Amino acid sequence: MPLRQYPERVTDDLIRWARAKPDAVFLAERRGETWETITFGAMLQRVRRIGAALLAAGGSHERPLAIVAENGIDHATIVLAAMYAGIPASPISTGYVRPDADPARLQALLGVLQPFAAFVPDAAYADRFAATAPALHLFKDASALAGDNASALADHGASNGDRPATRDPSAADRAHAALGGDSVAKILFTSGSTGTPKGVMITHRMLCANQTMLEQVWPDAIRDPVLVDWAPWSHVAAGNKNFGLVLRNGGTMFVDAGKPAPGAFDTTLRNLREIAPTFYFNVPRGWALLFEALESDDALATTFFSRLRILLNAGASIPESLRARLNALAQRYAGHDVPVVSAWGLTETAPMATAVWGERPAERETIGTPVPGVEIKLAPVEDRYELRVRGPSVTPGYWRNAEATAAAFDEDGFFKTGDAGALLDESDPSRGIVFGGRLAENFKLSSGTWVNAGLLRLDVIEAGEGTIEDVVFAGADRDELTAIVFVPRALANDPAIRERVRAALARHNECNPASSTRVARALIAAEPPNGAHGEITDKGSVNQRRVLQNRAADVARLYAEPRGSAIIVP
Protein backbone atom coordinates (compact mmCIF):
# COMPACT_ATOMS: atom_id res chain seq x y z
CA MET A 1 0.00 0.00 0.00
CA PRO A 2 1.55 3.36 -1.01
CA LEU A 3 1.78 6.13 1.55
CA ARG A 4 -0.80 8.85 1.08
CA GLN A 5 0.04 12.55 0.93
CA TYR A 6 0.64 14.12 4.33
CA PRO A 7 0.88 17.68 5.73
CA GLU A 8 4.16 19.54 5.48
CA ARG A 9 4.27 20.71 9.11
CA VAL A 10 3.02 18.92 12.21
CA THR A 11 1.61 22.20 13.53
CA ASP A 12 -0.68 22.40 10.47
CA ASP A 13 -2.87 19.88 12.32
CA LEU A 14 -3.27 22.30 15.23
CA ILE A 15 -4.31 25.07 12.85
CA ARG A 16 -6.79 22.77 11.10
CA TRP A 17 -8.57 21.73 14.28
CA ALA A 18 -8.47 25.23 15.78
CA ARG A 19 -10.48 26.33 12.76
CA ALA A 20 -12.72 23.25 12.41
CA LYS A 21 -13.66 22.81 16.08
CA PRO A 22 -12.05 25.52 18.20
CA ASP A 23 -14.05 24.69 21.34
CA ALA A 24 -13.24 20.97 21.38
CA VAL A 25 -11.06 19.81 24.27
CA PHE A 26 -7.56 18.93 23.11
CA LEU A 27 -5.77 18.20 26.41
CA ALA A 28 -6.89 17.58 29.98
CA GLU A 29 -4.74 17.50 33.11
CA ARG A 30 -5.94 16.52 36.56
CA ARG A 31 -5.99 19.23 39.20
CA GLY A 32 -7.15 17.63 42.42
CA GLU A 33 -10.70 16.40 41.93
CA THR A 34 -11.25 18.08 38.55
CA TRP A 35 -9.65 18.20 35.12
CA GLU A 36 -8.09 21.37 33.75
CA THR A 37 -8.60 21.50 29.98
CA ILE A 38 -7.51 23.47 26.95
CA THR A 39 -9.29 23.60 23.60
CA PHE A 40 -7.74 23.51 20.15
CA GLY A 41 -8.61 27.17 19.61
CA ALA A 42 -7.11 28.32 22.89
CA MET A 43 -4.01 26.20 22.34
CA LEU A 44 -3.30 27.76 18.95
CA GLN A 45 -3.55 31.28 20.36
CA ARG A 46 -1.17 30.44 23.22
CA VAL A 47 1.21 28.67 20.86
CA ARG A 48 1.45 31.69 18.55
CA ARG A 49 2.12 34.13 21.41
CA ILE A 50 4.64 31.89 23.15
CA GLY A 51 6.36 31.12 19.86
CA ALA A 52 6.94 34.84 19.34
CA ALA A 53 8.25 35.19 22.90
CA LEU A 54 10.71 32.34 22.37
CA LEU A 55 11.99 33.92 19.17
CA ALA A 56 12.43 37.25 20.97
CA ALA A 57 14.39 35.50 23.71
CA GLY A 58 16.92 34.10 21.24
CA GLY A 59 15.48 30.85 19.97
CA SER A 60 16.13 29.85 16.36
CA HIS A 61 16.51 26.83 14.12
CA GLU A 62 20.10 26.58 15.37
CA ARG A 63 19.38 27.30 19.05
CA PRO A 64 16.88 24.76 20.40
CA LEU A 65 14.81 24.87 23.57
CA ALA A 66 15.42 22.26 26.28
CA ILE A 67 12.30 21.11 28.15
CA VAL A 68 12.48 19.26 31.46
CA ALA A 69 8.93 18.81 32.68
CA GLU A 70 6.33 16.23 33.54
CA ASN A 71 3.60 15.69 30.95
CA GLY A 72 0.92 18.36 31.07
CA ILE A 73 -0.78 21.24 29.30
CA ASP A 74 2.13 23.64 29.84
CA HIS A 75 4.65 21.10 28.56
CA ALA A 76 2.55 20.51 25.43
CA THR A 77 2.09 24.24 24.87
CA ILE A 78 5.81 24.93 25.02
CA VAL A 79 6.67 22.06 22.65
CA LEU A 80 4.07 23.15 20.10
CA ALA A 81 5.09 26.81 20.41
CA ALA A 82 8.74 26.05 19.77
CA MET A 83 7.93 23.84 16.77
CA TYR A 84 5.49 26.46 15.42
CA ALA A 85 8.21 29.12 15.55
CA GLY A 86 10.85 26.94 13.92
CA ILE A 87 12.77 26.33 17.15
CA PRO A 88 13.64 22.66 17.73
CA ALA A 89 12.00 21.45 20.95
CA SER A 90 14.00 18.98 23.03
CA PRO A 91 11.99 17.24 25.77
CA ILE A 92 14.51 15.71 28.18
CA SER A 93 13.75 12.95 30.67
CA THR A 94 13.11 14.23 34.18
CA GLY A 95 15.44 11.47 35.31
CA TYR A 96 18.30 13.86 34.54
CA VAL A 97 17.24 16.20 37.37
CA ARG A 98 16.11 13.79 40.05
CA PRO A 99 17.95 13.90 43.39
CA ASP A 100 20.14 10.87 42.68
CA ALA A 101 20.96 11.84 39.09
CA ASP A 102 24.57 12.29 38.02
CA PRO A 103 24.97 15.97 36.97
CA ALA A 104 27.64 14.95 34.46
CA ARG A 105 24.99 13.23 32.33
CA LEU A 106 22.96 16.43 32.01
CA GLN A 107 26.10 18.45 31.34
CA ALA A 108 27.06 16.10 28.52
CA LEU A 109 23.58 16.27 27.01
CA LEU A 110 23.47 20.08 27.14
CA GLY A 111 26.93 20.19 25.61
CA VAL A 112 25.53 18.41 22.58
CA LEU A 113 22.22 20.27 22.45
CA GLN A 114 23.55 23.83 23.01
CA PRO A 115 20.11 25.28 23.78
CA PHE A 116 19.37 29.00 24.07
CA ALA A 117 17.19 28.35 27.15
CA ALA A 118 15.30 25.67 29.05
CA PHE A 119 11.71 25.33 30.23
CA VAL A 120 11.74 23.79 33.73
CA PRO A 121 8.50 24.59 35.62
CA ASP A 122 9.06 22.39 38.68
CA ALA A 123 10.96 24.31 41.38
CA ALA A 124 13.04 21.36 42.58
CA TYR A 125 13.92 20.34 39.02
CA ALA A 126 14.81 23.95 38.21
CA ASP A 127 17.17 24.21 41.18
CA ARG A 128 19.01 21.04 40.16
CA PHE A 129 19.10 22.11 36.52
CA ALA A 130 20.47 25.53 37.46
CA ALA A 131 23.17 23.96 39.62
CA THR A 132 24.33 22.02 36.57
CA ALA A 133 23.92 24.81 33.99
CA PRO A 134 24.02 28.11 35.93
CA ALA A 135 24.49 30.28 32.84
CA LEU A 136 21.47 28.97 30.96
CA HIS A 137 18.22 30.95 31.02
CA LEU A 138 15.34 29.05 32.62
CA PHE A 139 11.72 29.62 31.70
CA LYS A 140 9.42 28.46 34.49
CA ASP A 141 5.98 29.81 33.62
CA ALA A 142 4.17 29.10 30.35
CA SER A 143 1.43 31.59 31.20
CA ALA A 144 4.01 34.33 31.59
CA LEU A 145 5.51 33.50 28.22
CA ALA A 146 2.04 33.79 26.72
CA GLY A 147 1.74 37.27 28.22
CA ASP A 148 -0.63 36.27 30.99
CA ASN A 149 1.73 37.17 33.88
CA ALA A 150 4.32 39.81 34.57
CA SER A 151 7.48 37.76 34.06
CA ALA A 152 8.54 34.67 32.21
CA LEU A 153 12.09 33.90 33.24
CA ALA A 154 13.32 32.38 36.45
CA ASP A 155 16.02 34.13 38.41
CA HIS A 156 18.61 31.54 37.36
CA GLY A 157 20.89 33.34 34.92
CA ALA A 158 18.26 35.81 33.69
CA SER A 159 18.32 39.59 33.80
CA ASN A 160 15.47 41.97 33.14
CA GLY A 161 16.85 42.53 29.67
CA ASP A 162 16.35 38.84 28.92
CA ARG A 163 12.62 38.98 29.48
CA PRO A 164 10.56 38.56 26.29
CA ALA A 165 9.09 41.94 25.43
CA THR A 166 6.56 40.99 22.79
CA ARG A 167 3.40 38.93 22.63
CA ASP A 168 2.59 39.93 19.03
CA PRO A 169 2.34 36.54 17.28
CA SER A 170 3.25 37.85 13.82
CA ALA A 171 6.93 36.90 14.15
CA ALA A 172 5.96 33.33 15.00
CA ASP A 173 3.48 33.24 12.11
CA ARG A 174 6.21 34.31 9.69
CA ALA A 175 8.60 31.71 11.07
CA HIS A 176 5.91 29.04 10.75
CA ALA A 177 5.21 29.93 7.13
CA ALA A 178 8.90 29.44 6.32
CA LEU A 179 9.02 25.89 7.69
CA GLY A 180 9.23 22.86 5.42
CA GLY A 181 9.31 19.11 5.76
CA ASP A 182 13.06 19.09 6.38
CA SER A 183 12.82 21.60 9.24
CA VAL A 184 13.81 20.08 12.57
CA ALA A 185 10.78 19.96 14.87
CA LYS A 186 12.29 18.07 17.81
CA ILE A 187 15.54 16.73 19.14
CA LEU A 188 15.04 13.57 21.21
CA PHE A 189 17.94 12.00 23.04
CA THR A 190 18.53 8.28 22.88
CA SER A 191 18.10 6.46 26.16
CA GLY A 192 21.48 4.75 26.09
CA SER A 193 23.47 5.28 29.27
CA THR A 194 26.98 4.86 27.91
CA GLY A 195 29.04 7.34 25.93
CA THR A 196 28.02 10.82 24.79
CA PRO A 197 24.25 11.28 24.39
CA LYS A 198 23.00 11.41 20.81
CA GLY A 199 20.26 13.86 19.87
CA VAL A 200 18.01 12.42 17.18
CA MET A 201 16.75 15.06 14.76
CA ILE A 202 12.98 14.66 14.28
CA THR A 203 11.78 16.61 11.25
CA HIS A 204 8.29 17.82 10.46
CA ARG A 205 8.23 15.33 7.57
CA MET A 206 8.98 12.43 9.90
CA LEU A 207 6.16 13.34 12.28
CA CYS A 208 3.62 14.00 9.54
CA ALA A 209 4.47 10.90 7.52
CA ASN A 210 4.34 8.67 10.59
CA GLN A 211 0.87 9.86 11.56
CA THR A 212 -0.39 9.22 8.03
CA MET A 213 1.06 5.72 8.29
CA LEU A 214 -0.95 5.26 11.51
CA GLU A 215 -4.10 6.49 9.76
CA GLN A 216 -3.64 3.95 7.00
CA VAL A 217 -2.88 0.91 9.14
CA TRP A 218 -5.59 1.37 11.80
CA PRO A 219 -8.14 3.75 10.20
CA ASP A 220 -11.17 2.79 12.26
CA ALA A 221 -9.39 2.30 15.57
CA ILE A 222 -7.89 5.80 15.75
CA ARG A 223 -10.80 7.99 14.62
CA ASP A 224 -11.86 10.60 17.22
CA PRO A 225 -9.37 9.17 19.71
CA VAL A 226 -9.57 9.53 23.47
CA LEU A 227 -6.35 8.61 25.25
CA VAL A 228 -5.51 8.27 28.93
CA ASP A 229 -1.75 8.21 28.68
CA TRP A 230 1.09 8.09 31.19
CA ALA A 231 4.16 7.53 29.00
CA PRO A 232 6.69 10.41 29.15
CA TRP A 233 6.84 12.82 26.23
CA SER A 234 10.64 12.73 26.35
CA HIS A 235 10.23 9.27 24.83
CA VAL A 236 9.39 8.87 21.16
CA ALA A 237 6.40 6.53 21.55
CA ALA A 238 4.47 8.94 23.75
CA GLY A 239 5.78 12.30 22.61
CA ASN A 240 5.54 11.58 18.89
CA LYS A 241 3.08 8.75 18.32
CA ASN A 242 0.53 9.10 21.12
CA PHE A 243 0.52 12.89 21.34
CA GLY A 244 0.64 13.15 17.55
CA LEU A 245 -2.25 10.70 17.20
CA VAL A 246 -4.50 13.03 19.19
CA LEU A 247 -3.26 16.12 17.36
CA ARG A 248 -3.67 14.62 13.88
CA ASN A 249 -7.14 13.20 14.51
CA GLY A 250 -8.65 16.00 16.56
CA GLY A 251 -9.02 13.86 19.67
CA THR A 252 -8.55 14.38 23.39
CA MET A 253 -5.69 13.28 25.60
CA PHE A 254 -6.16 12.96 29.35
CA VAL A 255 -2.70 13.24 30.87
CA ASP A 256 -2.15 10.43 33.36
CA ALA A 257 0.29 11.36 36.13
CA GLY A 258 0.60 7.70 37.13
CA LYS A 259 2.85 5.03 35.70
CA PRO A 260 3.30 1.25 35.93
CA ALA A 261 5.39 1.30 39.09
CA PRO A 262 4.72 0.59 42.78
CA GLY A 263 2.99 3.53 44.44
CA ALA A 264 2.23 5.29 41.16
CA PHE A 265 -0.18 2.92 39.44
CA ASP A 266 -3.07 3.83 41.75
CA THR A 267 -3.18 7.22 40.02
CA THR A 268 -3.56 5.49 36.66
CA LEU A 269 -6.40 3.33 37.98
CA ARG A 270 -8.18 6.37 39.40
CA ASN A 271 -8.03 8.09 36.01
CA LEU A 272 -9.23 4.99 34.16
CA ARG A 273 -12.21 4.70 36.49
CA GLU A 274 -13.29 8.16 35.30
CA ILE A 275 -12.21 8.28 31.66
CA ALA A 276 -12.85 5.53 29.10
CA PRO A 277 -10.14 5.43 26.42
CA THR A 278 -10.71 4.43 22.81
CA PHE A 279 -7.01 3.68 22.22
CA TYR A 280 -4.73 2.44 24.98
CA PHE A 281 -0.96 2.08 24.94
CA ASN A 282 1.17 0.25 27.48
CA VAL A 283 4.31 -1.76 28.07
CA PRO A 284 4.40 -5.39 29.30
CA ARG A 285 4.92 -4.36 32.93
CA GLY A 286 1.92 -2.05 32.70
CA TRP A 287 -0.35 -4.70 31.18
CA ALA A 288 0.32 -7.11 34.04
CA LEU A 289 -0.61 -4.49 36.64
CA LEU A 290 -3.66 -3.35 34.67
CA PHE A 291 -5.09 -6.83 34.10
CA GLU A 292 -4.71 -7.64 37.79
CA ALA A 293 -6.79 -4.55 38.62
CA LEU A 294 -9.39 -5.15 35.89
CA GLU A 295 -9.99 -8.70 37.09
CA SER A 296 -10.81 -7.50 40.60
CA ASP A 297 -12.74 -4.28 39.91
CA ASP A 298 -16.01 -4.50 37.96
CA ALA A 299 -16.52 -0.74 37.82
CA LEU A 300 -13.03 -0.16 36.46
CA ALA A 301 -13.37 -2.89 33.83
CA THR A 302 -16.82 -1.70 32.75
CA THR A 303 -15.54 1.83 32.13
CA PHE A 304 -12.27 0.71 30.55
CA PHE A 305 -13.91 -1.51 27.92
CA SER A 306 -16.95 0.70 27.25
CA ARG A 307 -15.54 2.28 24.07
CA LEU A 308 -12.14 0.65 23.68
CA ARG A 309 -11.22 -0.10 20.06
CA ILE A 310 -7.58 -1.15 20.16
CA LEU A 311 -4.71 -1.90 22.54
CA LEU A 312 -1.15 -1.22 21.45
CA ASN A 313 1.71 -3.04 23.07
CA ALA A 314 5.13 -1.41 22.93
CA GLY A 315 7.74 -3.65 21.36
CA ALA A 316 7.29 -7.36 20.76
CA SER A 317 4.19 -9.38 21.52
CA ILE A 318 2.90 -9.80 25.06
CA PRO A 319 2.95 -13.28 26.61
CA GLU A 320 0.06 -15.56 25.67
CA SER A 321 -0.99 -15.84 29.32
CA LEU A 322 -1.63 -12.09 29.46
CA ARG A 323 -3.35 -12.16 26.07
CA ALA A 324 -5.71 -14.90 27.26
CA ARG A 325 -6.60 -12.85 30.34
CA LEU A 326 -7.32 -9.85 28.14
CA ASN A 327 -9.55 -11.83 25.80
CA ALA A 328 -11.57 -13.11 28.75
CA LEU A 329 -11.96 -9.58 30.12
CA ALA A 330 -12.95 -8.16 26.73
CA GLN A 331 -15.59 -10.82 26.17
CA ARG A 332 -17.02 -10.26 29.63
CA TYR A 333 -17.15 -6.46 29.60
CA ALA A 334 -17.22 -5.49 25.92
CA GLY A 335 -18.94 -8.54 24.47
CA HIS A 336 -16.30 -8.94 21.76
CA ASP A 337 -12.56 -9.26 21.28
CA VAL A 338 -10.47 -6.09 21.40
CA PRO A 339 -7.45 -6.22 19.08
CA VAL A 340 -4.08 -6.26 20.81
CA VAL A 341 -1.55 -5.14 18.24
CA SER A 342 2.20 -4.84 18.30
CA ALA A 343 4.33 -2.34 16.46
CA TRP A 344 8.04 -1.71 16.27
CA GLY A 345 10.30 1.24 15.77
CA LEU A 346 12.68 3.51 17.60
CA THR A 347 13.48 7.16 18.11
CA GLU A 348 15.20 7.38 14.74
CA THR A 349 12.09 6.09 12.90
CA ALA A 350 9.61 8.57 14.43
CA PRO A 351 8.83 5.80 15.84
CA MET A 352 6.58 3.34 13.97
CA ALA A 353 8.24 1.31 11.21
CA THR A 354 6.25 -1.95 11.38
CA ALA A 355 2.84 -2.91 12.72
CA VAL A 356 0.35 -5.74 12.79
CA TRP A 357 -2.17 -4.41 10.30
CA GLY A 358 -4.09 -4.91 7.05
CA GLU A 359 -6.82 -7.19 5.73
CA ARG A 360 -4.54 -10.16 6.33
CA PRO A 361 -2.55 -9.09 9.39
CA ALA A 362 0.73 -10.71 10.31
CA GLU A 363 0.89 -13.37 12.99
CA ARG A 364 0.43 -11.93 16.46
CA GLU A 365 3.73 -13.22 17.78
CA THR A 366 5.49 -10.89 15.35
CA ILE A 367 6.05 -7.14 15.15
CA GLY A 368 4.07 -7.15 11.91
CA THR A 369 5.12 -5.91 8.51
CA PRO A 370 6.40 -2.56 7.22
CA VAL A 371 3.86 0.26 7.36
CA PRO A 372 3.10 2.19 4.14
CA GLY A 373 6.09 4.14 2.87
CA VAL A 374 8.65 2.16 4.90
CA GLU A 375 11.17 -0.37 3.61
CA ILE A 376 12.83 -2.93 5.89
CA LYS A 377 16.11 -4.64 5.06
CA LEU A 378 17.25 -7.77 6.89
CA ALA A 379 21.02 -7.31 6.86
CA PRO A 380 23.33 -10.18 7.93
CA VAL A 381 25.36 -9.39 11.05
CA GLU A 382 27.49 -12.40 11.98
CA ASP A 383 24.92 -15.21 12.25
CA ARG A 384 21.89 -12.98 12.77
CA TYR A 385 19.97 -10.31 10.87
CA GLU A 386 19.77 -6.63 11.72
CA LEU A 387 16.58 -4.70 10.95
CA ARG A 388 17.38 -1.65 8.82
CA VAL A 389 14.87 1.01 7.81
CA ARG A 390 14.42 3.48 4.96
CA GLY A 391 11.54 5.89 4.37
CA PRO A 392 10.21 9.42 4.96
CA SER A 393 9.82 8.79 8.70
CA VAL A 394 13.54 8.06 9.22
CA THR A 395 15.79 10.69 10.81
CA PRO A 396 18.33 12.58 8.69
CA GLY A 397 20.81 12.04 11.53
CA TYR A 398 22.08 13.22 14.89
CA TRP A 399 22.19 16.81 16.08
CA ARG A 400 25.70 18.28 15.79
CA ASN A 401 27.23 14.83 15.31
CA ALA A 402 28.28 14.23 11.73
CA GLU A 403 30.41 11.21 12.64
CA ALA A 404 27.55 9.35 14.32
CA THR A 405 25.22 10.30 11.47
CA ALA A 406 27.56 8.87 8.84
CA ALA A 407 27.95 5.64 10.80
CA ALA A 408 24.20 5.20 11.24
CA PHE A 409 23.36 4.47 7.59
CA ASP A 410 24.48 1.73 5.24
CA GLU A 411 25.52 2.05 1.61
CA ASP A 412 21.89 1.91 0.46
CA GLY A 413 20.69 4.66 2.79
CA PHE A 414 19.03 2.31 5.30
CA PHE A 415 19.23 3.28 8.97
CA LYS A 416 21.03 0.63 11.03
CA THR A 417 18.75 0.09 14.03
CA GLY A 418 20.82 -2.29 16.13
CA ASP A 419 17.74 -4.50 16.54
CA ALA A 420 17.71 -8.13 15.46
CA GLY A 421 14.88 -9.76 13.56
CA ALA A 422 13.93 -12.46 11.09
CA LEU A 423 10.98 -13.44 8.94
CA LEU A 424 8.57 -15.80 10.66
CA ASP A 425 8.21 -17.62 7.34
CA GLU A 426 10.81 -16.94 4.66
CA SER A 427 8.42 -18.21 1.99
CA ASP A 428 5.68 -15.76 3.06
CA PRO A 429 6.93 -12.36 4.33
CA SER A 430 3.34 -11.22 4.94
CA ARG A 431 3.26 -13.42 8.06
CA GLY A 432 5.52 -10.87 9.72
CA ILE A 433 8.87 -10.24 11.31
CA VAL A 434 9.93 -11.89 14.57
CA PHE A 435 11.67 -9.40 16.82
CA GLY A 436 15.03 -10.63 18.11
CA GLY A 437 15.83 -7.98 20.70
CA ARG A 438 18.74 -5.59 20.74
CA LEU A 439 21.85 -6.98 19.13
CA ALA A 440 23.81 -5.43 22.00
CA GLU A 441 21.68 -7.21 24.64
CA ASN A 442 22.12 -10.62 23.09
CA PHE A 443 25.29 -12.38 24.14
CA LYS A 444 27.40 -15.46 23.55
CA LEU A 445 28.03 -18.30 25.96
CA SER A 446 31.58 -19.59 26.25
CA SER A 447 30.71 -22.14 23.57
CA GLY A 448 30.12 -19.32 21.08
CA THR A 449 26.36 -19.95 21.04
CA TRP A 450 24.22 -16.82 20.91
CA VAL A 451 21.54 -16.16 23.54
CA ASN A 452 18.60 -14.14 22.20
CA ALA A 453 17.66 -12.38 25.44
CA GLY A 454 14.56 -10.65 24.08
CA LEU A 455 12.77 -13.74 22.83
CA LEU A 456 13.98 -15.85 25.75
CA ARG A 457 12.47 -13.35 28.19
CA LEU A 458 9.02 -13.76 26.63
CA ASP A 459 9.29 -17.56 26.72
CA VAL A 460 10.26 -17.64 30.39
CA ILE A 461 7.53 -15.19 31.43
CA GLU A 462 5.02 -17.27 29.50
CA ALA A 463 6.16 -20.43 31.26
CA GLY A 464 5.73 -18.65 34.57
CA GLU A 465 1.96 -18.39 34.12
CA GLY A 466 1.84 -15.29 36.30
CA THR A 467 4.61 -16.30 38.70
CA ILE A 468 7.40 -14.47 36.85
CA GLU A 469 6.86 -10.76 36.21
CA ASP A 470 10.20 -10.14 34.53
CA VAL A 471 13.58 -11.77 34.12
CA VAL A 472 17.14 -10.74 33.30
CA PHE A 473 19.68 -13.22 31.95
CA ALA A 474 23.39 -13.59 32.67
CA GLY A 475 25.92 -15.83 31.00
CA ALA A 476 28.16 -13.83 28.68
CA ASP A 477 31.33 -15.90 28.19
CA ARG A 478 30.07 -18.42 30.76
CA ASP A 479 29.33 -22.10 30.30
CA GLU A 480 25.69 -21.85 31.37
CA LEU A 481 22.75 -19.47 31.18
CA THR A 482 21.38 -18.11 34.49
CA ALA A 483 18.63 -15.70 35.47
CA ILE A 484 17.63 -13.04 37.98
CA VAL A 485 13.86 -13.40 38.39
CA PHE A 486 11.45 -10.65 39.44
CA VAL A 487 8.16 -11.88 40.88
CA PRO A 488 4.88 -9.93 41.30
CA ARG A 489 4.54 -7.93 44.50
CA ALA A 490 1.54 -10.01 45.52
CA LEU A 491 3.66 -13.17 45.50
CA ALA A 492 6.85 -11.81 47.03
CA ASN A 493 6.09 -13.20 50.50
CA ASP A 494 4.42 -16.42 49.35
CA PRO A 495 6.25 -19.28 51.15
CA ALA A 496 5.86 -21.38 48.01
CA ILE A 497 7.32 -18.81 45.63
CA ARG A 498 10.70 -20.53 45.23
CA GLU A 499 9.04 -23.79 44.28
CA ARG A 500 6.68 -22.00 41.88
CA VAL A 501 9.60 -20.32 40.14
CA ARG A 502 11.54 -23.59 40.03
CA ALA A 503 8.56 -25.38 38.47
CA ALA A 504 8.07 -22.60 35.91
CA LEU A 505 11.70 -22.73 34.83
CA ALA A 506 11.56 -26.52 34.69
CA ARG A 507 8.57 -26.29 32.32
CA HIS A 508 10.49 -23.84 30.19
CA ASN A 509 13.63 -26.00 30.13
CA GLU A 510 11.68 -29.09 29.16
CA CYS A 511 10.53 -27.35 25.98
CA ASN A 512 13.79 -25.45 25.44
CA PRO A 513 16.70 -27.78 26.27
CA ALA A 514 19.37 -26.08 24.13
CA SER A 515 22.24 -24.39 25.95
CA SER A 516 21.15 -20.98 24.62
CA THR A 517 17.65 -21.31 26.09
CA ARG A 518 17.97 -23.61 29.11
CA VAL A 519 18.18 -21.74 32.43
CA ALA A 520 20.65 -23.64 34.62
CA ARG A 521 20.29 -21.56 37.78
CA ALA A 522 18.17 -18.67 39.00
CA LEU A 523 17.57 -16.51 42.01
CA ILE A 524 14.67 -14.32 43.00
CA ALA A 525 15.62 -10.65 43.20
CA ALA A 526 15.32 -9.25 46.70
CA GLU A 527 14.05 -5.92 45.35
CA PRO A 528 12.04 -5.00 42.23
CA PRO A 529 13.77 -3.11 39.40
CA ASN A 530 14.74 0.36 40.63
CA GLY A 531 13.95 3.20 38.25
CA ALA A 532 16.06 5.67 40.21
CA HIS A 533 19.09 3.46 39.57
CA GLY A 534 18.40 3.19 35.85
CA GLU A 535 16.94 -0.32 36.00
CA ILE A 536 13.66 0.78 34.41
CA THR A 537 13.62 2.84 31.23
CA ASP A 538 11.35 5.84 30.67
CA LYS A 539 8.88 3.63 28.83
CA GLY A 540 8.67 1.15 31.71
CA SER A 541 10.76 -1.74 30.43
CA VAL A 542 13.61 -3.35 32.37
CA ASN A 543 17.12 -2.24 31.42
CA GLN A 544 18.96 -5.56 31.28
CA ARG A 545 22.45 -4.11 31.15
CA ARG A 546 21.88 -1.82 34.13
CA VAL A 547 20.32 -4.60 36.24
CA LEU A 548 23.36 -6.79 35.63
CA GLN A 549 25.70 -3.92 36.52
CA ASN A 550 23.86 -2.94 39.69
CA ARG A 551 23.38 -6.52 40.85
CA ALA A 552 26.82 -7.88 40.03
CA ALA A 553 26.87 -9.56 43.44
CA ASP A 554 23.76 -11.55 42.50
CA VAL A 555 25.37 -12.60 39.23
CA ALA A 556 28.43 -13.78 41.15
CA ARG A 557 26.18 -15.82 43.47
CA LEU A 558 24.55 -17.49 40.47
CA TYR A 559 27.91 -18.89 39.37
CA ALA A 560 29.49 -19.48 42.79
CA GLU A 561 30.60 -22.92 43.95
CA PRO A 562 29.48 -24.38 46.20
CA ARG A 563 25.98 -23.28 45.30
CA GLY A 564 24.27 -21.03 47.87
CA SER A 565 20.93 -21.80 49.49
CA ALA A 566 19.16 -18.99 47.61
CA ILE A 567 19.97 -20.47 44.22
CA ILE A 568 17.14 -22.23 42.40
CA VAL A 569 18.02 -25.18 40.17
CA PRO A 570 15.12 -26.08 37.84
Regions found by a protein language model. Name each.
Residues 249, 278-281, 291-363, 375, ...:
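Gly/Ser/Thr-rich phosphate-binding loop
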Residues 208-226, 233-302:
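Conserved AMP-binding/adenylation subdomain of ANL enzymes
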Residues 469-474, 509-570:
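Conserved C-terminal "lid"/linker of ANL adenylate-forming enzymes
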Residues 37-41, 177, 185-212, 357:
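Conserved AMP-binding A3 loop
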Residues 22-25, 157, 162, 166-189, ...:
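Conserved pre-ATP/AMP-binding loop-to-beta segment of ANL
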Residues 84-164:
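Structural core segment of the AMP-binding/adenylate-forming
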